[in-house]
Amino acid sequence: MKLVSIFIGLLLGWVALPSFALAADPITVQEILDEPSRFHLRQVTLQGTVRNVQPLDPYTLPAGTTCYGAYLFYLEDETASINVAAFGLCGIPTVKDPDVEDGARIELHATIQAPSHGGYYLSFQGLKVVGEREGVIQAVADRITPLPE
């Protein structure tokens, strides 16, 4: 009987978990810009329009692995815009166009980076180290989904 209770508890937890994971309502870019430390290293859902897509040259991570197909763009919603980095594929030489184009409406699942404490971020010039005083706020793309027009 105890084993059945444990099994049912695990099953209910497994069934409920995806609903919590999918329940992330989109937030505005301005919410992130207003409180970047609150969102640092958290996953968020944003919706907006793609602007200024910039493919990046291959770059090398500090560990020596080269990454290909990375690009940057701005995601603009009705409140503000935020820099978005798509890291591409590391260790696999490839030539690939960005997954988005200027003017496209998308839903973005991303991890926010606001590394004012130091760290790395991807820029138009490649991988950069953040100084203690820099206020870089960036969304790192986890999943990009086109929105219907």
Per-range role (PLM):
Residues 6-18:
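Bacterial N-terminal signal peptides
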Residues 21-149:
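OB-fold and OB-like single-stranded nucleic-acid-recognition modules
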